[in-house]
Curated annotation (Swiss-Prot):
Subcellular location per the Swiss-Prot or TrEMBL entry: Nucleus; Chromosome
Annotated family: Belongs to the histone H2B family.
Composition skew (Basic and acidic residues), residue ranges: 1-17
GO molecular function: DNA binding; protein heterodimerization activity; structural constituent of chromatin
Protein name: Histone H2B.1
Organism: Candida glabrata (strain ATCC 2001 / BCRC 20586 / JCM 3761 / NBRC 0622 / NRRL Y-65 / CBS 138) (Yeast)
Encoding gene per record: HTB1
Post-translational modification: Monoubiquitinated by the UBC2-BRE1 complex to form H2BK123ub1. H2BK123ub1 gives a specific tag for epigenetic transcriptional activation and is also prerequisite for H3K4me and H3K79me formation. H2BK123ub1 also modulates the formation of double-strand breaks during meiosis and is a prerequisite for DNA-damage checkpoint activation. Phosphorylated by STE20 to form H2BS10ph during progression through meiotic prophase. May be correlated with chromosome condensation.
Swiss-Prot/TrEMBL keywords: Acetylation, Chromosome, DNA-binding, Isopeptide bond, Nucleosome core, Nucleus, Phosphoprotein, Ubl conjugation
One term under GO cellular component: nucleus
């Protein structure tokens, strides 16, 4: 009896944050494992929208997740500085947009700003309706 491996009929299950695992501790209470938050599911959804028949390795997903975290950190940091310069205690869409223009180069910044504006408009219209 030889078991043949058949090609997967559907996409492999995406990596999701680990569920909270419970193990009884010394005093009888169950301890929960902290969940690790990643952008993996969102990256996977975008990949499937743009290239439906393409997969992604765990290593590549990890690299992209680090990249998104890094860009997020840079934009948040720059937006925070901008808010402080203007003596504001709140980061608004304006600070985020300016931070994106300062951090991302040329054409990439233009596209990011237009997509961001579109997303904010879509969100605003959905919450008012």
């Amino acid at each position: 009896m030889s078991a043949e491996k058949k090609p997967a009929s559907k996409a492999p299950a995406e990596k999701k944050p680990a569920a909270k695992k419970t193990a009884p501790s010394a005093d009888g209470k169950k301890r929960t494992k902290a969940r690790k938050e990643t952008y993996s599911s969102y990256i996977y959804k975008v990949l499937k929208q743009t290239h439906p028949d393409t997969g992604i390795s765990q290593k590549s997903m990890s690299i992209l997740n680090s990249f998104v975290n890094d860009i997020f950190e840079r934009i948040a940091s720059e937006a925070s500085k901008l808010a402080a310069y203007n003596k504001k205690s709140t980061i608004s869409a304006r600070e985020i947009q300016t931070a994106v223009r300062l951090i991302l180069p040329g054409e990439l910044a233009k596209h990011a700003v237009s997509e961001g504006t579109r997303a904010v408009t879509k969100y605003s219209s959905s919450t008012q309706a």
